[in-house]
């Protein structure tokens, strides 16, 4: 677990703001592994760490997308905030300057998912929360400490990855793989509706390799 300014933001968001709960039942932080993502999508850069795909409020019985909300996305003007976001939540398909100027990826994620928790978190709080939750777990270092190390030719069973992430976060994750080549491309970490505790993801989309039950972690 990391200590950072955004970790302090997390405590403020959870305990001081006292947001209204009930519009969503759980929250999923979706982290993507850039190496695998960029094997199937042209990228401008490939960070050697997990990056944020999105922070998705959801319900167990239905999927929440493009919810009605008073606040639409407005471009982030603060340069420090843009730097913080780009470090943790970059658009891998565009150059840094373009990403920060046009903010298409952040706009898409907020309009599709962030508006579904707007009764609890405004736009600024939503992005702060996503970054703080990512910083809460140094997932790559933790996986390495448990013997799961990315690299060319590295393979692990789905069960080992699931159980290891359970040890790290206290909840079973949502694993996604690229089709065909079975590379681990995303890890979803689920939180309760108050975003205080990690829970088992309600609808885990685990990777389903054939034969050896191993998936690649490139």
From Swiss-Prot:
Glycosylation sites per record: 49, 59, 162
InterPro entries per record: Ribonuclease_T2_eukaryotic (IPR033697), RNase_T2-like (IPR001568), RNase_T2-like_sf (IPR036430), RNase_T2_His_AS_1 (IPR018188), RNase_T2_His_AS_2 (IPR033130)
Its EC number(s): 4.6.1.19
One of the GO BP terms on file: RNA catabolic process
Active site: 53 (proton donor), 109, 113 (proton acceptor)
Reactions accelerated catalytically: a ribonucleotidyl-ribonucleotide-RNA + H2O = a 3'-end 3'-phospho-ribonucleotide-RNA + a 5'-end dephospho-ribonucleoside-RNA + H(+)
Localization (cell): Secreted, Extracellular space
Binding-site residues for RNA, renumbered to this chain: 32, 53, 91-92, 105, 108-109, 112-113
Enzyme class, broadest EC rank: lyase
A single cellular component GO annotation: extracellular region
Cysteine pairings via disulfide bonds: 38-43, 67-116, 177-207, 190-201
Keywords for this protein: Disulfide bond, Endonuclease, Glycoprotein, Hydrolase, Lyase, Nuclease, Secreted, Signal
Annotated signal sequence range: 1-22
A GO molecular-function descriptor: ribonuclease T2 activity
Stated family: Belongs to the RNase T2 family.
Function in brief: Self-incompatibility (SI) is the inherited ability of a flowering plant to prevent self-fertilization by discriminating between self and non-self pollen during pollination. In many species of the Solanaceae, self-incompatibility is controlled by the single, multiallelic locus S. This stylar glycoprotein is associated with expression of self-incompatibility in potato.
Protein name (Swiss-Prot/TrEMBL): Ribonuclease S-7
Organism of provenance: Nicotiana alata
């Amino acid at each position: 677990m990391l200590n950072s300014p955004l970790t302090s933001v997390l405590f403020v968001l959870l305990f001081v703001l006292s947001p209204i709960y009930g519009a969503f039942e759980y929250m999923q932080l979706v982290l993507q592994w850039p190496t695998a993502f960029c094997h199937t999508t042209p990228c401008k850069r490939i960070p050697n760490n997990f990056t944020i795909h999105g922070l998705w409020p959801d319900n167990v019985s239905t999927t929440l997308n493009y919810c009605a909300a008073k606040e639409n996305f407005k471009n982030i003007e603060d340069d420090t905030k843009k730097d913080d976001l780009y470090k943790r939540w970059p658009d891998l398909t565009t150059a840094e300057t373009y990403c920060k100027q046009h903010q298409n990826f952040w706009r898409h994620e907020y309009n599709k998912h962030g508006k579904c928790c707007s009764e609890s978190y405004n736009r600024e709080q939503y992005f702060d929360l996503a970054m703080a939750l990512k910083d809460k777990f140094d997932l790559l270092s933790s996986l390495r400490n448990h013997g799961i190390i990315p690299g060319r030719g590295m393979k692990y069973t789905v069960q080992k990855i699931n159980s290891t992430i359970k040890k790290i976060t206290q909840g079973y994750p949502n694993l996604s793989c690229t089709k065909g080549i079975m590379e681990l491309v995303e890890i979803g970490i689920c939180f309760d509706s108050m975003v205080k505790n990690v829970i088992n993801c309600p609808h885990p989309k685990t990777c389903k390799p054939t034969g050896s039950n191993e998936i690649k972690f490139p």
